[in-house]
Amino acid sequence: MIKFENVSKVYPNGTKGLTDVNLQIDQGEFVAIIGTSGAGKSTLIRCVNGLNDVTSGRLFVNDTDVSKLKGKDLRKFRRHVGMIFQSYNLVPRVTVLKNVMFARVPEMNLFKVIFGLFSKEDKLVALDSLNKVGILDKAYIRADQLSGGQQQRVSLARALTQESEILLADEPVSALDPVTAKEVMDDFKRINEELNKTILLNIHHVELALEYASRIIAVKKGKIVYDGPSQEVTKEILDEVYRKEG
């Protein structure tokens, strides 16, 4: 469960990223965050795993108050929350399998990390994750030889290899063509339904958000202006979310 209690985020330059956000996301939900550029979508997601700190309020992931975590405790917490970015964050000249196994590094001792001594279990978990996103056959190919869509699947497999119950995604399909974007969204949907993973992603493709997510959260100027079922999102709601104010 993810729970925001009166969460606000103000950046050092005075910009308000979030203002008094209250929401709860239960385990197994597929939630899409929509809104204009700069509305606060990325800020909201990045607060969940502490990439952005909270200025005021409290933010819980299960029983952990993320807003109070610092240093080592925060790094330990992040191991259990998968994060997929718009940029794939892969090591180009390394195999797909090893890129995915890097998700296990925080659990390894320094000696094993230095020499890349992954366990048999690490390898099996990574291979299973690649299978779940349909690119098991690419395991021993270098990451830089894959298409954009395939690289994003590697990122998703790496997040699965963390064995976290929550997957956060920050504009995961914005750099992909429409066909490939739908294929990656299919992966998210399948993982949500088959593994009961909580999916929280922000996305600028409204039509994809409405098609795949069961719940829509719309953000405007750092405030939640809609939070409800995707099938209840109307043209009037979208007009309000995306209307420019002079």
UniProtKB/Swiss-Prot annotation:
Pfam families: ABC_tran. It is found in: Cell membrane. It is a peripheral membrane protein. InterPro entries: AAA+_ATPase, ABC_transporter-like_ATP-bd, ABC_transporter-like_CS, ABC_transpr_PhnC, MetN_ABC_transporter-like, P-loop_NTPase. GO terms for cellular component: plasma membrane. Residues 2-246 form the ABC transporter domain. Keywords: ATP-binding, Cell membrane, Membrane, Nucleotide-binding, Phosphonate transport, Translocase, Transport. Its main location: membrane. It catalyses: phosphonate(out) + ATP + H2O = phosphonate(in) + ADP + phosphate + H(+). ATP binds at G35, T36, S37, G38, A39, G40, K41, S42. GO terms for molecular function: ABC-type phosphonate transporter activity; ATP binding; ATP hydrolysis activity. The keyword Repeat does not apply. Its EC number is 7.3.2.2. Part of the ABC transporter complex PhnCDE involved in phosphonates import. Responsible for energy coupling to the transport system. Belongs to the ABC transporter superfamily. Phosphonates importer (TC 3.A.1.9.1) family. The complex is composed of two ATP-binding proteins (PhnC), two transmembrane proteins (PhnE) and a solute-binding protein (PhnD). NCBIfam families: ABC_phnC (TIGR02315). This is Phosphonates import ATP-binding protein PhnC. It comes from Lactococcus lactis subsp. cremoris (strain SK11).
